[in-house]
Regions:
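Long, Pro/Ser/Thr-rich low-complexity/intrinsically disordered regulatory tracts in eukaryotic proteins
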Residues: 2-17, 23-198, 213, 227, ...
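Conserved phosphate/anionic-ligand binding catalytic regions in large, soluble enzymes, centered on
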Residues: 200-217
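Structural signature of FAD isoalloxazine-binding scaffolds in flavoprotein oxidoreductases
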Residues: 220-223, 229
């Protein structure tokens, strides 16, 4: 059965020493070394930035990114969690061969063998939201096929054999769905998917059986938190079949007033029904957050401006910053930016900081393992380099 037909069916569903005065030359070389190190660090920092951080897209002041994930498995091979090492290798080799043969579609893509990366490099990919924590812990015969702009990714041997993922800035659920659906249609021409007429697409996680679709959006909801409305509202979100999690999804800690909202089940719904339902709930959350911001303004504009200004002052001048404190301060500054109280700080910069201040990225920048104290020190350095 063709993919399009199935989607309408059960899925309803990064000097050589010169001659001359040794003293002067040594000083010059030191300056060059320092400059060179700075260039390398800038290059590394740039490598850790991707499209979803650019601060554009609809409702980008509240919705940081939208993501679609489509789980698929190969018929006749056990799910990765049940597969032997030989079976995982078979899946890896098969998909690697397919990706290399399909030059028309994947010629510009990069195939990243995760077992060939250091733990820190894998952690960076997680912090960029490109792979899961599972793939950091279990990288053997796992891979990431990544588009040049890092919008589209295909994860190999994660929870399922294939996880197609699109990640876009702002509220762009439909566009993200179109991206994964297009790749899914293309791959089904060359892969025999595990599919059941009664249930739909078969997946390792029971809640994904049917369409295999997980739709989500990452929201910044500071006003709802500050006004004390967040628990009531998130409880209501849970009652309509949606999950509320931290920035990295299931099991991740909620911090910086960031909340990831996603669907929990797919069976009995079409893909469009899933993402449109999520879209409707997110729009309600956006309206409630805007109303709460007006409430804060009415209670005292100067209080809000002072809050953002104090947060900016600490971020710009503190010598040591813990992760949780930094996230909270970035949230305060972001609220000030979003409400027109703080000038000259693009949302793009604040989005990038959400990733750059994390332990993996900090250690990647310094090319070594850092202690807790060293991370706090480097975190303040990086924040002050980024903020105007």
């Amino acid at each position: 059965m063709k993919n399009n037909e199935r989607k309408q069916g059960r899925g309803k569903k990064v000097f050589k020493e010169k001659e001359g005065n040794p003293g002067l030359q040594g000083e010059t070389e030191k300056e060059l070394d320092h400059k060179g190190a700075g260039i390398i660090e800038d290059q590394k920092r740039a490598e850790m930035i991707c499209t979803w951080m650019d601060g554009t897209g609809p409702e980008a002041d509240i919705v940081i990114n939208s993501r679609m994930q489509l789980a698929r498995n190969i018929k006749g091979i056990p799910f990765p969690c049940l597969a032997t090492e030989e079976q995982r290798e078979k899946v890896f080799s098969l998909l690697e061969k397919i990706f290399k043969e399909q030059q028309e579609r994947f010629s510009a893509y990069s195939l990243i063998n995760l077992s060939g990366l250091s733990p820190i490099k894998r952690q960076v990919l997680t912090e960029k939201q490109l792979i899961s924590l599972l793939m950091v812990r279990e990288p053997e015969y796992s891979a990431l096929l990544l588009s040049p702009d890092e919008v589209m990714g295909i994860l190999v041997n994660e929870e399922d054999h294939l996880l197609l993922q699109a990640l876009l800035p702002g509220l762009q659920l439909e566009k993200a769905w179109e991206a994964v659906s297009c790749h899914d249609d293309y791959l089904e021409e060359v892969i025999d998917y595990a599919f059941c007429e009664e249930l739909g697409y078969l997946t390792a996680c029971p809640t994904k059986v049917g369409t295999g679709l997980r739709a989500s959006a990452l929201l910044h909801l500071p006003a709802l938190v500050i006004t004390g409305q967040i628990n009531r509202i998130l409880s209501a979100v849970g009652q309509v079949g949606l999950a509320v999690e931290g920035i990295y999804g299931e099991g991740s800690q909620m911090t910086g007033r960031l909340f990831q909202i996603s669907n929990q089940v797919t069976l009995g719904q079409t893909e469009e029904e899933i993402w449109r339902n999520l879209y409707g709930v997110i729009n309600k959350l956006i309206n409630q957050e805007r109303a709460a911001r007006e409430q804060l303004l009415n209670a005292g504009r100067e209080k809000l401006a002072d809050r953002a200004g104090r947060a900016y002052g600490i971020l710009k001048h503190a010598r040591l910053l813990g992760f949780q404190e930094a996230m909270q301060l970035i949230s305060d500054v972001r609220l000030g930016v979003e409400m027109g109280m703080v000038d000259n700080i693009p949302l793009k910069t604040l989005n990038e900081l959400l990733v750059l201040i994390r332990s993996g990225c900090l250690q990647n920048l310094k090319e070594k393992t850092l202690s807790h104290y060293e991370r706090d020190l480097e975190r303040s350095v990086q924040i002050q380099k980024c903020l105007p």
